[in-house]
């Protein structure tokens, strides 16, 4: 008996768009409040990850079949797929061409990039997404390139250096940026009505 294993991460289907999407960044922050003074002690741990909840528009069987085949190939929480914020596939900034990581072994919430047009303003705008390696980051301040086409870019969440190596000269994706996600449940289900309209939803969390 042959056993077929899909090649993960799968490509998110585009046969229909999404009706609604919630996209969130979850952080792991511990808060301990003193019962005597009311003062808080805050500790931010390393854990931070994107989550999404998607509702597809009502669809007929032919389109629903594509979505269902995609979901079933994920095999519950086993498989992964690539997806980003479906309403923010393009940047507001002026960046063009190939942008690259400028220096290896970078960590934290700022990354040095190069390959921008020299002295160009607003190459990225606050709220733009960029993808470095397999993972997704949001730019948190407007970015201007210097005379050498370089810029330091502030991002959230922190770089995933401990999960995936970030190499010098790695290409930075800024159009249709994505991350890798995994379904939140091992159960895959869908609804249908009397005219064969399908209702399909999914919930997923970044696969770190």
Role assignments for model-derived ranges:
Residues 1-208:
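Extracellular/virion structural assembly segments
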């Amino acid at each position: 008996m042959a056993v077929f294993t899909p090649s993960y991460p799968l490509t998110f289907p585009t046969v229909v768009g999404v009706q609604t999407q919630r996209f969130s960044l979850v952080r792991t922050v511990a808060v301990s409040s003193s019962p005597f003074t009311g003062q808080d002690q805050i500790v931010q741990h390393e854990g931070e990850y994107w989550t999404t909840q998607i509702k597809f528009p009502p669809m007929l069987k032919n389109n629903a079949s594509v979505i269902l085949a995609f979901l079933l190939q994920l095999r519950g929480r086993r498989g992964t797929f690539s997806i980003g914020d479906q309403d923010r596939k393009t940047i507001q900034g002026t960046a063009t061409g190939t942008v690259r990581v400028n220096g290896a072994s970078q960590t934290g919430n700022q990354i040095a990039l190069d390959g921008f047009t020299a002295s160009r303003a607003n190459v990225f705008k606050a709220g733009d997404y960029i993808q470095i390696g397999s993972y997704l980051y949001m730019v948190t301040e407007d970015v201007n390139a210097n005379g050498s086409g370089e810029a330091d870019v502030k991002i959230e969440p922190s770089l995933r250096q401990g999960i995936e190596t970030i190499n010098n000269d790695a290409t930075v994706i800024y159009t249709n940026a994505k991350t890798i996600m995994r379904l939140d449940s091992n159960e895959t289900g869908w609804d249908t009505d009397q005219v064969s309209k399908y209702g399909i939803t999914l919930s997923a969390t970044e696969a770190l």
